[in-house]
Amino acid sequence: MIPGEYAIQNGDIEINPGRETLSVEVANTGDRPIQVGSHYHFYEANNALQFDREKTRGFRLNIPAGTAVRIEPGQSRTVELVAYAGQRKVYGFQGKVMGPL
């Protein structure tokens, strides 16, 4: 292998296979664009985003790591979320959970 070389498998790569997912309609009620990162606990996303928060507890965006979704002011869109895995403990963000889910 050459340093920096990529070894990419053929076909599509499925992210988060076999994990629980859900789709949620989200609206930006604020006056500025809002970006939510791939691993941000969606339940604790910006308060200007209007959606069924309780339904999203323990979920994050089902998008590739390191990417984000941007929602413009007044925009509404459907996003797919995926359940957190591992120990299912959430700390930080807006401090609404701070422990086990």
Swiss-Prot record:
It catalyses: urea + 2 H2O + H(+) = hydrogencarbonate + 2 NH4(+). It is found in: Cytoplasm. GO terms for molecular function: urease activity. GO terms for cellular component: urease complex. Its EC number is 3.5.1.5. Heterotrimer of UreA (gamma), UreB (beta) and UreC (alpha) subunits. Three heterotrimers associate to form the active enzyme. This is Urease subunit beta. It comes from Alcanivorax borkumensis (strain ATCC 700651 / DSM 11573 / NCIMB 13689 / SK2). The lineage of its organism: Bacteria, Pseudomonadati, Pseudomonadota, Gammaproteobacteria, Oceanospirillales. The gene is ureB.
